[in-house]
Amino acid sequence: MWLKHELVLKNTVRLPLLATLTTALMLSSMLVGCLGGNLENDIVYPDDVMYESTNATIVEVWEDGAVVETTYPVLSFDFNESSAPSAFLSYTVRGTYVDETVDASQTTVVDVEFKHHGFHTLELIANYEDTPDERGDDSRHLNEIVVRIEKRIEWRESSTNEPIPMTLDSRHEVGDHPPSVLVLASTVHNPALIANVGGGQEVEVLWELIDDTQEACQFQPGTVKDGESASWNTVHFNTDEVHDLRVTYEEGQDAIDVSHTVDIEYEALETVPTA
């Protein structure tokens, strides 16, 4: 009798345990189906969008006080490796000052032109047909990235007796971060009065970087001999305001050529390229 009772007790314990294990296996199978299959089919991974560069520079050229040329950089974003449950309809790159969309049946590359310096926060979006996501939107938000756009200003004046002040508005045009530094390179050339002979005089000049209080933040005097050049190279870190770069010299001296190059640079906080 004792042996029989023991056998019944063991069977009683095994049956609930078997039921528990069976339930666990069923739940596990359901979770595998939900987490495995759907994720593979439905999610478009951010790294599937390829971009070789996330920083570029606007170049603005001035001659005798007027803008003559501006070159805006173009960055490309390739959605070729992206995947979704159904066919893509379009690809979009969108930000504060940019909004470019292409037909997915024609190309996978979105080219974006940047006309404002600073940090652009961009959304990379793909639209695919008849498969609303959990938000009830046919658009699948792929990723959000940051692009750094800097600016270079090239300034030239020829044969001038009254150099024009170069106004530098270095305040950031997009994003929350001001430029990290202004890099200035200025050259004054004193052309020979008679080519290959000379006969002119040396020129005394003064470079000044003037802030919005009309005070000189920095200055540099220089002497430019006949037929030669002199330069002033400096950096300035108070960037989120307007300055004037001035070259002055005494009246009655020989006409001079003036050239400035100013780079408005930002800290490298952009997203790392994927290609």
Task: Label the model's feature ranges.
Residues 72-86:
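Acidic, Ser/Thr
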Residues 110-116:
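Residue-level recognition of secondary-structure-to-loop junctions
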Residues 98-107:
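Short beta-strand segments within Ig-like beta-sandwich modules, predominantly Fibronectin type-III
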